[in-house]
């Protein structure tokens, strides 16, 4: 827990320093949130000093906390997402579901998909025997979502053997 506390303190100090220079920027992109705790204090300060574009690709307003972070639940504020969206000049949402939520607070919403549309972008056919890497881009606190894929990944590994590896 002390390691997480150190991360929070470092993040707070970094954001405080940024406030001094924020007027130098025409646009400030906020991805997810400016500070991990429940307050929108930093986002409100940023909005007074610059133009905010909010970019998100997860349903972060839902009150979901992993088992690892349950002790810190009281520090979270799911309503924060809507408040940040209201402060923003533009919102980039990763999909239609997120865009629909954002539209409740801000009409200037654009969908920027976080997944690749394989109907538009066709993978190149591979003729070589290189290994294929399958990666996970989640975090320790969202590992339960990854765990739902384990059976499928085992089947892939059984079928393709050493041609496939995981990161």
Please report, for each region that a protein language model flagged, where it lies by residue.
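Carbohydrate-associated surface elements
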Residues: 97, 115
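Hydrophobic/aromatic residues located in beta-strands of well-ordered beta-sheets
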Residues: 52, 91, 109, 164-166
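Hydrophobic residues at beta-strand termini and immediately following loops
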Residues: 112
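Short His-centered aromatic/hydrophobic patch
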Residues: 30-36
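Conserved catalytic-core segment of nucleotide-activated headgroup transferases in glycan assembly
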Residues: 117-121, 127-167
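Membrane-proximal helix-turn-helix segments that form the acceptor-binding/catalytic region
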Residues: 11-25, 37-48, 54, 58-62, ...
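Helix N-cap/beta->alpha junction signal
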Residues: 32, 95-96
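Acceptor-binding helix/loop patch of EC 2.4 sugar-transfer enzymes
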Residues: 1-5, 53-82, 117-119, 129-130, ...
